[in-house]
Design a protein with these regions (language model features):
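Phosphate-/nucleic-acid-contacting segments
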Residues: 146-192
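Short, well-ordered alpha-helical scaffold segment located
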Residues: 76-77, 109, 132, 181
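Cyclic nucleotide-binding regulatory module and flanking cytosolic helices
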Residues: 1-27, 83
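Short, Lys/Arg-enriched anionic-surface-contact patches
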Residues: 79, 138-151
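Cyclic nucleotide-binding regulatory domains
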Residues: 10, 36-96
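A small-molecule sensor/coupling module
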Residues: 90, 109-144
């Protein structure tokens, strides 16, 4: 739990009283490799901190092709935010790429703490600003304005060591390229 608190306080400081109230909402959950935390079409009500393991969020096009939107590793918050906030079904599926240990909480119960714990509300706002606004915008711009090699190098910085933990085709999908293109990029970088 201390590792989680440290990670949270990198975003925003919270009081001991707020921490106690928040941790009372957490319950452990295990998701096996290939298991689903939230499926496209489900109404998301929960969010989860990743204690251990790797998860991806992806969507499918009309033909069924999968596109990776993001990855979640230790310390990250996984949530179908659009579904939780809008009350509409999720467009994303959250799949475990390894066995995953989660600390799960009900989002509405978390919001219920805001009246007495303003620091938790501030934490959520800062998390949303950082992860779901700033980083999302930067990624969208990178997908259009940078070459695949630059996107791959940025992926390595954003997710250190992840490329050794997940299949390469998931990375290629995230970068918006084919697995063959990714192999060529990796080969060129190793040669230089």
């Amino acid at each position: 739990m201390e590792a989680l608190r440290t990670k949270i306080e990198e975003i925003s400081a919270i009081s001991d009283r707020s921490w106690t109230a928040f941790t009372a909402l957490l319950s452990p959950k295990q998701v096996p490799k290939g298991g689903i935390f939230c499926r496209e079409g489900d109404l998301a009500r929960e969010a989860a901190f990743i204690k251990e393991g790797v998860m991806r969020a992806f969507f499918r096009d009309a033909e069924g092709a999968e596109y990776n939107k993001t990855f979640f590793c230790e310390g990250n918050l996984a949530c179908s935010l659009a579904s939780v906030l809008s009350g509409q079904p999720s467009y994303l599926t959250f799949e475990a790429l390894s066995p995953v240990s989660l600390l799960v909480f009900n989002y509405q119960e978390f919001q219920g703490l805001f009246a007495q714990h303003r620091d938790l509300e501030s934490l959520l706002r800062k998390l949303l600003e950082q992860k779901w606004v700033v980083e999302k915008e930067q990624r969208e711009i990178r997908l259009v304005t940078t070459k695949a090699t630059e996107r791959y190098l940025h992926f390595q910085k954003e997710y250190p060591g992840l490329e050794n933990r997940i299949p390469q085709y998931h990375i290629a999908s995230y970068l918006g390229i084919s697995p063959t293109q990714l192999s060529r990029i990796r080969r060129k970088l190793m040669e230089s």
